[in-house]
């Protein structure tokens, strides 16, 4: 078994390849490393010269033309925002800044400041023009970020490259919370994957997205605040067991796991509208 680790997009990527010569495996890993770093230069909120930072700085002044790939991601975000009734919203960035989740200077803001910040949150403030891939922000202070979907998008691009290279079996993991199992190791029915509750599942040609706040939170005056904010209220979502979503598309699994953590009542809508996904909020028996 070959395995490779590298950092990109603020997380650790891991690639497992069960077959092939070491030189070939290293070449495959190099292709994926290059791709994730290319995406980081496009999507990062923390690189001042990224495409996203340029968009955030200028799109409220005039329409900005973006690459078709980025425009496709924005269209996906728009669709998921509608599907989840606003629980998934990449314009949440002003709220993330307000609570200190961007600069790591954590604080609990007052209700009036939260209400004011909410005026700059909402995908309806991001106007998309497909003819030319133009993007315009309706208000100054609107900011996009892809923390709830970017890892899934990156994993999806990695899987695309693996298939182009003819790789029959691989596991691509982004941060332990978003992964895709391509094929299966020789002699196995799938890739054995451990869930946060300690149980294991077998995945084959499937993606997994997991969301929870057990690892990222802060406390103020004895009150615990998780890092997953509800873009509809401006406050952290109530702490609850992790949510796992299994499906064909790692992008969907990444985004929907976050949305369902924020609003569990959306589960029936997701099951109806996205027949290729399986959802568990209890984390037991998923995919067995």
Predicted ranges, named:
Residues 1-288:
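Mature catalytic core of soluble alpha/beta enzymes
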